[in-house]
Amino acid sequence: MSDQANQGDLEIRPSPLLKVINDLHSKYKSLKEGIVANYIPELAKVNPDLFSISIVTVDGQVYQVGDYQQLFTIQSISKVFAYGLALEDHGRDYVLTRVGVEPTGEAFNAIILDEQSKRPYNPMVNAGAIATTSLIKGAGATERLNRVLEMFRRYIGHDVFVDISVFTSERSTGHRNRAMAHLMLNFGMIDRNIEEALDLYFQQCAVMVNCHDLAVMAATLANRGVNPITGEQAVNSRYIKDILSVMYTCGMYNFAGEWAYKVGIPAKSGVCGGIMAVVPNLMGIAVFSPPLDIRGNSVRGVKVCEELSQQLGLHLFECMKVGNGEWGVGNCEC
């Protein structure tokens, strides 16, 4: 187990924050609750003992522990970034005609649309994400995929690739997603070829990342769309408010309300076992641990984020000092 990063020329220095995440990793690494996602055959093969925590601050400091270099497919966390790309392509008003922003108490893969508008409820559930991905511009399937991969590169700071075995596994078993897509096609929420739209959705979910990558992506959102490691603008800053608002209200599926109450920061989970959380103007947090609870969220990930929020005073509505400035983001106090 490593407790520091060695990625390029990133600045690493001893910090109370590193002790906090080391202690949390030690506390929860023996936890055996939850089960690995098994409805996608390739995901069922993942080692349930993998566990890592990464934090990247908006000034580029990195703190991490555990299996933070272990690659895994990004899955539903990709929905956050596809939504941002759709906003850049069409603007918020048009995107709102196709995908709502309302939380839903239903499961993330529920075959359901808003009864009045016939839109999917929000971009963070499967139906909404499929509709969002179908909005991404491009002359053809290859160009749209390349735009998605280039988008991820800006957020992460290096090239990414699609795990073909996971993509084909999801494609061959994604019948609920096809049902959602056909339902949305019927109501005019998708106007693209169904299989082409689904292929891009499955491909974006099968992009390979590690825990460090997720933390950099979260820190980019925390830094108004600027990657704190590379300095590159990954997404137009005007859409950060939209992205974080939907993450806060809808990002944790039908656990979103309890998450907002207990943790109080924008976040997105995925059935890969990843959780990505954003503390605006401060840091990005990522946790990877494959065993999931009944809602599809990482068991260890939820517990770690709850404790980080409590110990560091990260809840958006908590007015208190976060630290003494030693870990590079200064004090957060009202």
UniProtKB/Swiss-Prot annotation:
The keyword Hydrolase applies. Its EC number is 3.5.1.2. Substrate binds at residues 76, 126, 170, 177, 201, 253, 271. It is an enzyme of class 3 (hydrolase). GO terms for molecular function: glutaminase activity. SUPFAM superfamilies: beta-lactamase/transpeptidase-like (SSF56601). Keywords: Hydrolase. Gene3D superfamilies: DD-peptidase/beta-lactamase superfamily. GO terms for biological process: glutamate biosynthetic process; glutamine catabolic process. It catalyses: L-glutamine + H2O = L-glutamate + NH4(+). InterPro entries: Beta-lactam/transpept-like (IPR012338), Glutaminase (IPR015868). Pfam families: Glutaminase (PF04960). Belongs to the glutaminase family. HAMAP family: Glutaminase. NCBIfam families: Gln_ase. Homotetramer. This is Glutaminase. It comes from Nostoc sp. (strain PCC 7120 / SAG 25.82 / UTEX 2576).
